[in-house]
Amino acid sequence: MTHTTRASLRDSAIGRKRTRIKRLEIFLSLLPVVLILLVFRVYPIVTALAKSFTNWDGLYRSDWVGLRNYVTFVQEGTFWMILRNTLILLLNVPLQVFIGIVVALLLYERVAGWRIYRAVIYTPQIISAVIIGFLFKIFFGFEGPFNAVLKAVGLGTLAIEWFGNSYTALGVIVFSIVWFSIGWQAIVILGGMSSIPPSVFEAAVIDGANYWQRAFRIVIPMLVRVLEFSIIASGVWTLTQLFPFLFAMTKGGPGYETSTLDYMIYLKSYGLGFGRDYGTATAVAMILLLLVLALTVIEMRLANRADDWG
Amino acid sequence: MKRLFTFSLLLVFLLASVAITLSSCGGKKEAVKLTVWMNGADSIIGPTEQQKPQDQWYVSQAFRRFEKANPGVTLELVVQADQGAAHTNFKTAGLAGNAPDVANLWTGQPIFALKEVILSLDKLVPADDLKYIVGWESVRDGFKPDGTILGYPAAQNQICHMLYNKAIVKKAGMDWEANPPRTIEEFDSALAKIKAIGVTPIVVDEAAQGVPWFFCWVADYWWTQMTTNDGILEETYGRKKFAEDKGFLATLAYYRSMYVKGFFRKDLTTANDSFTQFLNGKGALWPAVTSFLADAEKSLGADCGVLLPPEFDPNAKLVNSTVGGPGQSFVVAKNTKYPQMAVKLISFLNSKAEVLAAQKINRYPIVRTDVTPEEMGWVPGSNIAKLHKYSTTYNYWVDNLLTSGPAEIFYTQTSLVAVGKMTPLQLAEAMDKKAAAQ
């Protein structure tokens, strides 16, 4: 064996050892996060998935019932209404993103009084969602201020029972969510805009680009990843975090006319009825999980395509 | 001398040790602490009591009396603001083995559904309590006369009725104290007269709190008049059909007709301020249980009257009655370490002396048969005395008969029938579907 060969073997042994050490480092670095994910994410999801195939009552009864919970829930007659409500409420996402961009651009360009606007626009975020829900319930109540104003200006025919009809009630809920969220959207987008060199905006202004052209030709194309984050975050939030708004404003009613999938999880688990149908509640949670995953994948693919165009 | 001194010292030390040991063994009793969950409304905590400091509440004072009578026992009061959630919380705590020793829950199906975590009281209830307290059927498993006793009926008896504003009724040309409407036709005609003077006849929040209050407190009486509680139980267990229950369908149809005729406030499915409106004279009637009487009398004074539901079918077996009874119970958790003491506490709260003491703070028709209205200090002909007449002739809560599936539909969708978004038959069929799936 030549000296070169020996040296080469030694080097390769050292290389393998280094690779092993590197792998061990990676493994040990990831281990805490993986363990946390396994315990706090994977285990509950797998348990919920398993429970969704049982008649679990939250206590001792947990017999295998196959797909019965899913089939019964879908066949209940209210499923499609609940799914429709859930999807209608997602309309708040494009609305809040659009208004968020408009507001962020105004703040970025430091219009007169921008400091006050920045503080005011974020205020709803620090108010409890339950309080916001109650405020909107009172404001849009049949005998509330909104209808009083309509009547005062001679539009009494428009003074309807806003929460008495599925579509108008959902419209009010969407409005309240947008009102609540535009501050957050504006701050997120404003944060993204700080990564765009000011010279780009200055050049656009010199070239005669107006406000809307700057919004649609500069901000949106250059902030695809930020918008992707805000759309996914808002979408997931809409699908899973609307409970306090619904509870305060409509309690999912009248009937199930403003109930959503996440509200149904509550109703099946804790609603009046005393049976505590946790089996069905977990089945609804699984359906919601699938919906969240599907919408996230679709949105990410669209964002990737948009980024490619950019 | 030295030996004697040493011996004496040892003897004193020995005697002192024995004395200390004996005193620590025999003199000190084991400390007993009971945790008690109490509903914050419609319970022995009255609605107006909560405006006072907690130590001035009747229940706090009763607890101090019990502690004084039972040295070594301490009671911890935990108020449950959300009664519906209290059931789930109790169940969850029971599963974990740390449920409160005593809990104030609803009678009927709500506690039947929790029997895995509730202690059977069959061998613990004193004979006198069984003799003098009414409403045991509401806490016996399955409503069977020999069913396991899952709890005590709570000390107050809730009698369903309608509170009404005498001034408005008088303005409409009627006097319900002398001549109350007793049939559906008379009731219809009376409500029409109230509407004619520009006042909403009945103000009610029929869905805002997830319960159709008018139906549960008034119309349920009409339903059970025609179907009977046994018939409703057959339906909820899936042995008969709600959709074939003529009494149920007729009651729902009348309920719908009341809305069409403008007898209810227009926004009854979304309103949540009806009691305030009633107290402010914006409505003539408000469906109620006894716990609201004190507040109404305080606001309306002599203009506050009570009206019992008219008879839907004057030829029915059940007449001159109303829905009610002890809607609340006291149960003992299976995991309690002190079952005897827990039952002793509940028995104490239901005792004649405590019932009389409670009446000084809250006024309720009671569940004891050995207390007269005179002992309670009720003026003959007063609203409370009128309601007390039904203390032993009430018809047990219909909605508490419903099992979870049909109950879910009943609570969430009955108001939709009133506003015409659902037909009576559709509601009944939906309840049947749930009953069949149980």
Residue ranges and their predicted role:
Chain B
Residues 261, 298-363:
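Extracytoplasmic/periplasmic substrate-recognition and gating elements
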Residues 122-135, 179-180, 202, 223-250, ...:
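Short, solvent-exposed loop/beta-turn-alpha elements that line the ligand-binding surface or hinge
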Residues 81, 106-160, 215-216, 305-308:
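Hinge/lid segment of periplasmic solute-binding proteins
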Residues 144-155, 160, 185-238, 283:
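Extracytoplasmic/periplasmic solute-binding protein
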Residues 74, 78, 170, 355, ...:
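Conserved C-terminal helix/tail region of periplasmic/extracytoplasmic solute-binding proteins
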Residues 101, 130-169, 316-323, 393-400:
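A structural signal for short loop-to-beta-strand junctions that line the ligand-binding cleft
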Residues 19-111, 115, 129, 176-177, ...:
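Conserved N-terminal structural module of periplasmic/extracytoplasmic solute-binding proteins
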Residues 188-193, 234-268:
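Glycine-centered hinge/linker elements that transmit conformational signals in sensory
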